[in-house]
Amino acid sequence: MVSKAARRRRAAPRQQQRQQSNRASNQPRRRRARRTRRQQRMAATNNMLKMSAPGLDFLKCAFASPDFSTDPGKGIPDKFQGLVLPKKHCLTQSITFTPGKQTMLLVAPIPGIACLKAEANVGASFSGVPLASVEFPGFDQLFGTSATDTAANVTAFRYASMAAGVYPTSNLMQFAGSIQVYKIPLKQVLNSYSQTVATVPPTNLAQNTIAIDGLEALDALPNNNYSGSFIEGCYSQSVCNEPEFEFHPIMEGYASVPPANVTNAQASMFTNLTFSGARYTGLGDMDAIAILVTTPTGAVNTAVLKVWACVEYRPNPNSTLYEFARESPANDEYALAAYRKIARDIPIAVACKDNATFWERVRSILKSGLNFASTIPGPVGVAATGIKGIIETIGSLWV
């Protein structure tokens, strides 16, 4: 009989051979894994280097907040060729919400207009409640002071992005209520209506007027929304969702929509837009951001409203702004692909405390989805501290 110890001694060389064979077979696998990781890093670096400086500036303007001192970039790097005037609009304003009311802040892609504001009783409809404009600083310098010279300096526009944030400043013992955010697709249309002329017999004439479709959504809360306590605040972005960045003309002669001599019923509009001290300038190709703040009776809700927009204008040659125009940047497919990827994947909105998480998500989209490294600063200081792993190669571009 062969003892167990003897059998173990005889089997030991065979076990050692198998272990050595396994180690030898694993070595190529490890080398392949290292080679794959090395190739991925090289691809990330190559793609980053392939992206042009104007492309990086475009993403910086589109997705960096106004808290950072950045220029508006050199324009949208698509196939358009011509002189453009990139502009980064910024608004920072304190706001107090009326107790017992629900306040609608509609951030729409209207050049020079930060948002439209309306108030209604809690639970009531916004139908027929005028949306009053809140202008960006410098509106008159860009669009003139009268409705007849709105297009004297710039004749056309297209949006790269816009964003808005409500940052509560209320006392923690006095606030109450909720904040809800969702997107509304608005469209400028030309509607017809019949007008009776006092002749004998009376004559009916067909008239045309511009109108904004989609405002009925002010009374709707879609499933795809952000809802939270007022004290949590919100931050949201909207980008161009059309296949191309199309230019739209600057509208002239409209102090309201519909015009003053046309009723909402005639224009088939849910409610009207008023522009006290400003004018209606047109409507771009991106969803409006609807921010609904509900303030119960007795609550004290105050906040800082921040709105920003990256817009590209076509300057008028007879304007003094023409000398500041520049050639539109060359087509950059890497930057445009990054823009579209982020547009698909960013959430409707986030709470103020989650700003860092929001921007970490944007950064991960750029790294994993497109295999190039970048870093994007956040909308508030807390967001900037949440970003890790800044790539030194392009870090200076995002400071």
Swiss-Prot record:
Active-site positions on this chain: 67
InterPro entries: Peptidase_A6, Viral_coat
UniProt: Ca(2+) 2 binding residues: 216
Annotated keywords: Aspartyl protease, Calcium, Capsid protein, Disulfide bond, Hydrolase, Metal-binding, Protease, T=3 icosahedral capsid protein, Viral penetration into host cytoplasm, Viral penetration via permeabilization of host membrane, Virion, Virus entry into host cell
Superkingdom of origin: Viruses
Sequence positions that bind Ca(2+) 3: 216
GO biological process assignments: proteolysis; symbiont entry into host cell via permeabilization of host membrane
EC number assigned by the record: 3.4.23.44
An example Gene Ontology CC term for this record: T=3 icosahedral viral capsid
Pfam families: Peptidase_A6 (PF01829)
Disulfide bonds: 61-310
Start-end of Low complexity biased regions: 13-27
Gene3D superfamilies: 2.60.120.20
GO MF, any single term: metal ion binding
Protein name: Capsid protein alpha
Protein's organism: Nodamura virus (strain Mag115) (NoV)
